[in-house]
Amino acid sequence: MGGFLPKAEGPGSQLQKLLPSFLVREQDWDQHLDKLHMLQQKRILESPLLRASKENDLSVLRQLLLDCTCDVRQRGALGETALHIAALYDNLEAALVLMEAAPELVFEPTTCEAFAGQTALHIAVVNQNVNLVRALLTRRASVSARATGTAFRHSPRNLIYFGEHPLSFAACVNSEEIVRLLIEHGADIRAQDSLGNTVLHILILQPNKTFACQMYNLLLSYDGHGDHLQPLDLVPNHQGLTPFKLAGVEGNTVMFQHLMQKRRHIQWTYGPLTSILYDLTEIDSWGEELSFLELVVSSDKREARQILEQTPVKELVSFKWNKYGRPYFCILAALYLLYMICFTTCCVYRPLKFRGGNRTHSRDITILQQKLLQEAYETREDIIRLVGELVSIVGAVIILLLEIPDIFRVGASRYFGKTILGGPFHVIIITYASLVLVTMVMRLTNTNGEVVPMSFALVLGWCSVMYFTRGFQMLGPFTIMIQKMIFGDLMRFCWLMAVVILGFASAFYIIFQTEDPTSLGQFYDYPMALFTTFELFLTVIDAPANYDVDLPFMFSIVNFAFTIIATLLMLNLFIAMMGDTHWRVAQERDELWRAQVVATTVMLERKLPRCLWPRSGICGCEFGLGDRWFLRVENHNDQNPLRVLRYVEVFKNSDKEDDQEHPSEKQPSGAESGTLARASLALPTSSLSRTASQSSSHRGWEILRQNTLGHLNLGLNLSEGDGEEVYHF
């Protein structure tokens, strides 16, 4: 029953250790697990004790336990004991025999790295073997044991994430009885795993949303926190996320709605009107360092943006944007536009003087040059320009002071990489401000070449104006579309274009290398050949030709191939790629614009003084509701569903009358609801006696009937009806 002997390392394994990790990849995780499980089965077949535990062979098991040569604590390929094997295969009788013979097995964890820390209690809980769980707890199995192996971590390569404690395992498999048993035996509902996640956090991440909501309520019922402890649902993990915020980041709309139902207070019901108070704790971004709204819009999951359509988030964002966000954003856009006009004017009228001395080269066409600092501010016009330059410099400093703190707060990768948060525009505006300061330094030090940073600053500064289009529903999604095309389609296309241009430019250069450059010199110099090929690729110029001389024969062949590949194939491919990107973004343009509005609102709320942006909602202190803030929403529900049913009966009777008047016309049968929902919209053509007005009237009734019955069959809840919401503060 001894362990495996270590294998001798051959030349291959030694070479693998010496080679860099990027040359020799580690073994795939799935293959590694497959190998471990195959070794486990092999080890079970080789060990009589493990095999008897697997097969629940009690007679053999008792004989082995009486044999003094049998090591009851022997382990399998995964570092598991015989009790782990019995629990894995739900063999209660074998587990009881093993615990009677060796009670210490109850506390033994698995030693394999992938499953480290897993006890028999973890396995029994996952398999929902209630009797075995009771037996283990009776023998004082540890309810605080932690399964810390790599197979239990929150990772894309793992199919499940149940946390580390037996209680979280029981909650994730939705075993209410086992959860109660563990809590009664001292399981800590506030226990956190290595990520800081409590059992509530882990429930948010489970795929079965309905069971997760039920278990969430059960666990909260055991939260008997004292005055010195915060509520269980407000305990953050290591990322600072509470279960509520984690639901927003993950886009778990079911859990979000469930939690909001627990936070709402119905004030009154007046016929179809219902007044509801929603608790804005953790929702309102006012004064929050880790804003819920910012977390939602910056989430990598598209489902997270659906949270923005849920009550009361939708109403809160709408109020903030319409009352504060839109006016301040328009003012900010106007100020930036005036600022760019000022900077552009200063650049246009920069101090220049006539160049002294004679030109030394025939291709030199420069007639003006930059003035020295001592000569640049002498006239009245220079003083006016100086004021504009000071405004430009102060504006650049303000931009840097506003942008740099957010980089450290959010993180560079997230701040510059999230399109919804502004992403590339932050890079552009920071680069612009830096170039303005570089231009100032060059002006003060009399350094020639200020035109370089100045020209780049003008381009970047005016490109930043596109950032303010996010305040308009028609233009906002187009900025995202442009960004996706530039960083997606264009980047991929540039790699292909570079390969094609490099290959054909080299060919053109070789062809014209022996020719007279005075007759056709576009390809004589290699850099010029690259530039000419680039222009030909984009069809900026036509193919160079000189009909007074004989061109090389290979030029026609290579140019023909280049025209087919570049103009007909690759450019049209690029257009098709951009068209596909446009279609994909257009499908979610409204959703993207709402996310842009939320991100802009949070940005303005964070940067503006509190006196300019008061807190939204109703303070509960004034009405005996504590120190929390609330949002009042009025729902209007249609409480007369029988009216819709009467419309359906009218449509059915109308169909019967049409059948009697026109027996030759075949109408769809109303026996099945699916057939009613797919009522035919085709006009009857067999009868020619119907007038045009009758046909038009019949078409209108058909459309109205199809829409009404379609809504019914699509799951319209007649007990609630359609409702609209009005929010108040």
Curated annotation (Swiss-Prot):
<dbReference type="InterPro" id="IPR008344">
    <property type="entry name" value="TRPV5/TRPV6"/>
</dbReference>
<dbReference type="GO" id="GO:0098703">
    <property type="term" value="P:calcium ion import across plasma membrane"/>
</dbReference>
<feature type="repeat" description="ANK 1">
    <location>
        <begin position="44"/>
        <end position="74"/>
    </location>
</feature>
<comment type="function">
    <text>Constitutively active calcium selective cation channel thought to be involved in Ca(2+) reabsorption in kidney and intestine. Required for normal Ca(2+) reabsorption in the kidney distal convoluted tubules. The channel is activated by low internal calcium level and the current exhibits an inward rectification. A Ca(2+)-dependent feedback regulation includes fast channel inactivation and slow current decay. Heteromeric assembly with TRPV6 seems to modify channel properties. TRPV5-TRPV6 heteromultimeric concatemers exhibit voltage-dependent gating.</text>
</comment>
<dbReference type="Pfam" id="PF00023">
    <property type="entry name" value="Ank"/>
</dbReference>
<dbReference type="GO" id="GO:0060402">
    <property type="term" value="P:calcium ion transport into cytosol"/>
</dbReference>
<dbReference type="GO" id="GO:0070588">
    <property type="term" value="P:calcium ion transmembrane transport"/>
</dbReference>
<dbReference type="GO" id="GO:0046872">
    <property type="term" value="F:metal ion binding"/>
</dbReference>
<keyword id="KW-0597">Phosphoprotein</keyword>
<feature type="transmembrane region" description="Helical">
    <location>
        <begin position="386"/>
        <end position="408"/>
    </location>
</feature>
<feature type="topological domain" description="Cytoplasmic">
    <location>
        <begin position="470"/>
        <end position="492"/>
    </location>
</feature>
<feature type="transmembrane region" description="Helical">
    <location>
        <begin position="493"/>
        <end position="513"/>
    </location>
</feature>
<feature type="binding site">
    <location>
        <position position="542"/>
    </location>
    <ligand>
        <name>Ca(2+)</name>
    </ligand>
</feature>
<keyword id="KW-0106">Calcium</keyword>
<dbReference type="InterPro" id="IPR024862">
    <property type="entry name" value="TRPV"/>
</dbReference>
<keyword id="KW-1133">Transmembrane helix</keyword>
<dbReference type="GO" id="GO:0005262">
    <property type="term" value="F:calcium channel activity"/>
</dbReference>
<feature type="transmembrane region" description="Helical">
    <location>
        <begin position="557"/>
        <end position="577"/>
    </location>
</feature>
<dbReference type="Pfam" id="PF12796">
    <property type="entry name" value="Ank_2"/>
</dbReference>
<dbReference type="InterPro" id="IPR008346">
    <property type="entry name" value="TRPV5"/>
</dbReference>
<dbReference type="GO" id="GO:0006816">
    <property type="term" value="P:calcium ion transport"/>
</dbReference>
<dbReference type="GO" id="GO:0005886">
    <property type="term" value="C:plasma membrane"/>
</dbReference>
<keyword id="KW-0040">ANK repeat</keyword>
<feature type="topological domain" description="Extracellular">
    <location>
        <begin position="349"/>
        <end position="385"/>
    </location>
</feature>
<feature type="topological domain" description="Cytoplasmic">
    <location>
        <begin position="1"/>
        <end position="327"/>
    </location>
</feature>
<keyword id="KW-0406">Ion transport</keyword>
<dbReference type="InterPro" id="IPR005821">
    <property type="entry name" value="Ion_trans_dom"/>
</dbReference>
<feature type="repeat" description="ANK 6">
    <location>
        <begin position="239"/>
        <end position="268"/>
    </location>
</feature>
<comment type="similarity">
    <text>Belongs to the transient receptor (TC 1.A.4) family. TrpV subfamily. TRPV5 sub-subfamily.</text>
</comment>
<keyword id="KW-0479">Metal-binding</keyword>
<feature type="region of interest" description="Interaction with S100A10">
    <location>
        <begin position="598"/>
        <end position="602"/>
    </location>
</feature>
<feature type="compositionally biased region" description="Basic and acidic residues">
    <location>
        <begin position="654"/>
        <end position="665"/>
    </location>
</feature>
<feature type="region of interest" description="Involved in Ca(2+)-dependent inactivation">
    <location>
        <begin position="700"/>
        <end position="729"/>
    </location>
</feature>
<dbReference type="GO" id="GO:0016324">
    <property type="term" value="C:apical plasma membrane"/>
</dbReference>
<feature type="repeat" description="ANK 5">
    <location>
        <begin position="195"/>
        <end position="228"/>
    </location>
</feature>
<dbReference type="GO" id="GO:0005516">
    <property type="term" value="F:calmodulin binding"/>
</dbReference>
<keyword id="KW-1003">Cell membrane</keyword>
<feature type="glycosylation site" description="N-linked (GlcNAc...) asparagine">
    <location>
        <position position="358"/>
    </location>
</feature>
<dbReference type="GO" id="GO:0035809">
    <property type="term" value="P:regulation of urine volume"/>
</dbReference>
<comment type="subunit">
    <text>Homotetramer and probably heterotetramer with TRPV6. Interacts with TRPV6. Interacts with S100A10 and probably with the ANAX2-S100A10 heterotetramer. The interaction with S100A10 is required for the trafficking to the plasma membrane. Interacts with calmodulin. Interacts with BSPRY, which results in its inactivation.</text>
</comment>
<feature type="repeat" description="ANK 3">
    <location>
        <begin position="116"/>
        <end position="145"/>
    </location>
</feature>
<dbReference type="InterPro" id="IPR002110">
    <property type="entry name" value="Ankyrin_rpt"/>
</dbReference>
